């Protein structure tokens, strides 16, 4: 494992200089989820949530979050993203439903897009919670994790199941 590079000679935080890093295509896929009641699942599926199209709004929120990651993660470099795709899948679990969220982010640059994908997945889940909390505040946001990344000096990564 490499040493941390986000500290200067005085031990204080710094943004890493990436100007000498090779420009390559970089991708990242992050996942999150939110567990909801059958009532919320039905209301989302039938577009009966008062705040509007939950999945449509959450998808846009995820894309916006990916684009603004450097505004909320202090040492994250601002990146020109080439693409962001937020997708959903439902999984029934006993009497509840889990909304699975997957975010794919792509750029061509000197640093990776893992944080953008993770931020987008998190914000997508938070947006679903916000839009549905009037129905039930007991929703549970699940684990958020990096599934895969490609490109860059550290090489490719694929999470073990």
Swiss-Prot record:
Biological processes annotated in GO: Mo-molybdopterin cofactor biosynthetic process
**Which residues are listed for substrate binding in this entry?**
75-77, 115-116
In its UniProt entry, the species of origin is given as Bacillus cytotoxicus (strain DSM 22905 / CIP 110041 / 391-98 / NVH 391-98)
Question: What CDD domains does UniProt report for this protein, alphabetically?
Answer: MoaC_PE
**Keyword annotations of the record:** Lyase, Molybdenum cofactor biosynthesis
Which pathway does the protein contribute to? Cofactor biosynthesis; molybdopterin biosynthesis
PANTHER family linked: CYCLIC PYRANOPTERIN MONOPHOSPHATE SYNTHASE, MOLYBDOPTERIN COFACTOR SYNTHESIS PROTEIN A
Instruction: State what protein this is by name.
Output: Cyclic pyranopterin monophosphate synthase
Q: What is the lineage of its organism?
A: Bacteria, Bacillati, Bacillota, Bacilli, Bacillales
């Amino acid at each position: 494992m490499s040493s941390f590079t986000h500290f200067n000679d005085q031990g204080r935080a710094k943004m890493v200089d990436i100007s000498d890093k090779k420009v390559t295509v970089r991708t990242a896929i992050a996942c999150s989820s939110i567990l909801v009641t059958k009532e919320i699942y039905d209301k989302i599926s039938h577009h009966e949530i008062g705040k509007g199209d939950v999945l449509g709004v959450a998808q846009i929120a995820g894309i916006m979050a990916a684009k603004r990651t450097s505004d909320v993660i202090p040492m994250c470099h601002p990146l020109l993203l080439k693409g962001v795709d937020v997708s959903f899948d439902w999984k029934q679990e006993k009497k509840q439903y889990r909304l699975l969220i997957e975010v794919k982010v792509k750029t061509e640059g000197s640093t990776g897009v893992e944080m953008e994908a993770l931020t987008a997945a998190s914000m997508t889940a938070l947006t679903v919670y916000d839009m549905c909390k009037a129905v039930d505040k007991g929703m549970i946001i699940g684990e958020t994790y990096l599934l895969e990344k490609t490109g860059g000096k550290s090489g490719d990564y694929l999470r073990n199941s």
